[in-house]
Amino acid sequence: MTRYQHLATLLAERIEQGLYRHGEKLPSVRSLSQEHGVSISTVQQAYQTLETMKLITPQPRSGYFVAQRKAQPPVPPMTRPVQRPVEITQWDQVLDMLEAHSDSSIVPLSKSTPDVEAPSLKPLWRELSRVVQHNLQTVLGYDLLAGQRVLREQIARLMLDSGSVVTADDIIITSGCHNSMSLALMAVCKPGDIVAVESPCYYGSMQMLRGMGVKVIEIPTDPETGISVEALELALEQWPIKGIILVPNCNNPLGFIMPDARKRAVLSLAQRHDIVIFEDDVYGELATEYPRPRTIHSWDIDGRVLLCSSFSKSIAPGLRVGWVAPGRYHDKLMHMKYAISSFNVPSTQMAAATFVLEGHYHRHIRRMRQIYQRNLALYTCWIREYFPCEICITRPKGGFLLWIELPEQVDMVCVARQLCRMKIQVAAGSIFSASGKYRNCLRINCALPLSETYREALKQIGEAVYRAME
């Protein structure tokens, strides 16, 4: 991000937060230049960016003023999915979206990929090169089945931040959170079982269940506080549910952080009904609040919570470094790993361990939390400007994803196909439901570095939505 873009996003965030009100005069170009230690031309470029976004308006010989803006869209209401076990569909839509990822000319607003070009990742790339040059025998040999111990020790220390007390021996390294969740599900479930999920739910988890022949029951979920404990309890009383998949921290796709009281209530239900919790914490490190939120796993006393995570969202998906703390299922999951995915790549594990050990990881996370928070604020500004006023939009407490609910008559599955022909890709809401609900919703990735390309893409999405409403 250039200096003027950084300044523009900072000012946009202040406008979004109400620190600069409608009609209020903004600081002069000279005073902002002195305050932030940047050139006059940098401030002028930042103001021109905000003017293009229609956040500010210039007045001759008077300066810049905050523009009249649309009202803040409301947060989507509690979801109301079909509350009975169903077989998972939507694979064709997911496959179409995944295949489009290979087209580098497409604006990729559908992928939940972090910013992998952040300068704070440079120490990791240097360490990867060093590891390969100086540890050739280890790098080219077989890995330990549980993964490199030095990495497991660092992950155990990281997990202390979320309240989970584990040792290196409690952790199994995988090739990503998707692999962690897949192994966890296979260690517990069999074809014909029923698993409860939040609604909407990350499509990758549901497609894993589909491949295993497991049915899903979607549970109503509040976009600000998470899964309905009451609805979950009712489902547990009605159906032989084997387990529940939860993303309680910086949820994908809704962005909420489940309050601690609700996390403990869900764990209490799991204990009472003797079910397993599959906890996905892959976005937990990106929470806006500090210290980061606790995991459900941190309150687990009998090993029924299988905690899955990775560096895919906090660092980069290409590392293929994930982990699982499987509790009472440790031995079974080790066998599943040996039988199915076997060993991991030692080089990326060793580099990641050093990246954490030397403090680079925490510096990187602090920086990315700020950047993603500003990106979310700025993308929200753009969406408010270009989309119909009838929308609802989430207010994430971390991560980098936005969930937008459009008027009922908008079929985002059809709109997404049109946008793909225009070289813009979004994730239609229906792939986040086992039964194909949320066709009038979409998920947007806000991790991508701010640029005119993404602003223009959001403008074209808004125009396509308006056409769908006609």
UniProtKB/Swiss-Prot annotation:
PROSITE patterns, per database record: HTH_GNTR
Keywords: Aminotransferase, DNA-binding, Pyridoxal phosphate, Transcription, Transcription regulation, Transferase
MF (Gene Ontology): DNA binding; DNA-binding transcription factor activity; pyridoxal phosphate binding; transaminase activity
GO biological process, one term: biosynthetic process
Domain HTH gntR-type: 1-69
Superkingdom of source: Bacteria
Family matches, as InterPro entries: Aminotransferase_I/II_large (IPR004839), HTH_trans_reg/aminotransferase (IPR051446), PyrdxlP-dep_Trfase (IPR015424), PyrdxlP-dep_Trfase_major (IPR015421), PyrdxlP-dep_Trfase_small (IPR015422), Tscrpt_reg_HTH_GntR (IPR000524), WH-like_DNA-bd_sf (IPR036388), WH_DNA-bd_sf (IPR036390)
Pfam families in UniProt: Aminotran_1_2, GntR
Modified residues (N6-(pyridoxal phosphate)lysine): 313
Family of the protein in this entry: In the C-terminal section; belongs to the class-I pyridoxal-phosphate-dependent aminotransferase family.
Protein name (record): Uncharacterized HTH-type transcriptional regulator YjiR
